[in-house]
C-alpha cells in the first residue's frame, strides 16, 4: 500500500500557504465557512461538530473554535453531515459510453470528486492519441480525474487484433504528467509471474508510483509471485476467501460493483475496522442508465450501510480516505486542515442523500455543469473519425458446419459476472442438446480483413434476434451474438454503418441502435439523452429473451482473454485458464 505523500499531486505555493495559515490562525478572512454541520470522523468514528473553514482550494480549519470566524460567504448546511468527496479507485470512463466531460457532469453532483481512470479502451483503438485526449480532459476538469498509464495494449500479446500499440517509450512520455498516478492494471499476470522482461521493464519504470493489478481467482505460489513483482492491488476478486488471501499477502482490495461485474455482496463481509485502510471501492464499468437511476460510488456506500451493516465511518472511509492513501494522494480523503476542500454534504448519511458538493473549495452547480458541457467538450478536441475499417458482411460469413454426434465447446455465461465457464454440447440433426446455445462471432475492425471468428454461446438467455457492438474488451472489435446468421449480419452492418455502436435486431429488423462516434466507444450526447437511449436498447434486448441485467456490458467481456475460462477473440477460441487457443470441436 502506497502510504507516502506523493508531492507530485500536492501543488501549493508559498503564498497559498501563508494565506491558508493566516485563516487557520484567525488572522484573515475565509473564503467560505460551512455552518450548522457535523463532520463524520473517518479515523475515530463518531462526529465532529463545528464549522468547516475554507481558504482557496483547501480546508483551513475544522471545529467549534471557528464558530465566530469571518468569511466572505457562509454556507448553511442545515444540519447536514459532511464527508470527504468520494473516490472511484478503478474505472474505464469509456465503458460508460460518456466522454470524460459528460461523465463529470453526470457524477460530480453525486459526490464523486475523484476518479482513478485507466483509459485503455480508447488506447487500444487509437493508441497514444486516445491517452492524450484523456489527459486534456483531466487537465480542464473540475473533478479530480487522475490517470493510470495503460500497461497492456493489447490485453495479451498475440491473442487479438487491436487498433494501436502503446510502447514503453510512449508510456514513459506520460509518466511525469501531473494527472498520472501510476501504472494501470497489469493484466498479463502469467507473464509477470514467469518474469517476462518486457513486463518487468514496465513495472520498474513506474515503481515509484502505484502499480495496479488484475488477477481474478489467482492463488497459491502464483499469487505470491505476482505480488512479489510489486503489484499493489486487485479489482478482479470475486470470492470471499480469494479477497481475504490477497489482503493477508499485503495486497489492497478494490471491491468492484459495476454494471456487469458485481462483486460487492461477495466481498463486503471482509470489511472491518482493521483492514478497511486496505479496502477501496470501484466500479470498473458502469453505464449511464445505472448512474442516473442508482448512482455511482454513492450507490456502493449505500449498499454497504443498508445491506451489510458496515459502520458509517468505515463505509465512507473505504470510499475516500483508503483510496487517497493508496495512491499517494494525501491531500485528499479527509476533512482536515490542509486537505483539499472536496466536501460532500449529506442530508441523510445512512441513505447517502447528497445535498451539496464542493470540489477544490468551490460549490458545484449541476445546471452550470450541463450548460458548459458542450463548450468544454469542444475545447478538449475529441479524436473524431471513423475507426471501423470493415466492409459490410453477409449471412454466409457466419456459416458454421457441425457434424452430428460430435461435441463442441460452448462459452457458458454467468449472469452478472465477467468470468465464464467452459462446457461442451453434442450436436445432432435436431440441433444441440441444450436449447440455450446460440452463436457468437468476433470480427476485427482495423483493416486486417480477417474472416470472422465464430463460436457457440450458452447461458446468455438469447432466444431470438441478435445483438452487436463495437464495445468489446479490450481490443474493441465487433462482437455479435445471435440465433440466425441473417440477423447477425444485419446487426453487424448497422454498427458498421454507424461508425461504431450498439444494435438490437429482432424479427429481421433493427429494433434499436446507438451510434458511438468517438472510437466506436463513446457518444457525444448528454448523460440524460444517453441514459434514455440505453433504456430503449435494453428494452429492445429484453424482447430477445431473459438476458443478463446489462446485456451489452456482459457481452463486451466475452472476448477478453485475460479473464477465464473460455473467450472468443478475433483470432479464435481462447482458453483463459491455460492461456492458449483451443478448438471449437472437442477432440480430447
Swiss-Prot record:
Q: Which GO terms describe its molecular function?
A: adenine deaminase activity
The EC number(s) this enzyme carries: 3.5.4.2
Reply yes or no: does the keyword Manganese apply. Answer: yes
Q: Which enzyme class, named as a word?
A: hydrolase
Name what cofactor the protein needs: Mn(2+)
Q: Which InterPro entries does this chain map to?
A: Adenine_deam, Adenine_deam_C, Amidohydro-rel, Metal-dep_hydrolase_composite, Metal_Hydrolase
**Record has Magnesium as a keyword:** no
Write out the catalysed reaction.
Answer: adenine + H2O + H(+) = hypoxanthine + NH4(+)
Biological process terms in GO annotation: adenine catabolic process
The protein's UniProt keywords, in alphabetical order, are:
Hydrolase, Manganese
Look up the domain of life of the source: Bacteria
Which Pfam families did the record assign? Answer: Adenine_deam_C, Amidohydro_1
What protein family is recorded?
Belongs to the metallo-dependent hydrolases superfamily. Adenine deaminase family.
What binding partners and quaternary form does the record give?
A: Homodimer.
Q: Extract the NCBIfam families matched here.
A: ade (TIGR01178), PRK10027.1 (NF007457)
Q: What is this protein called?
A: Adenine deaminase
Gene that this polypeptide is encoded by = ade
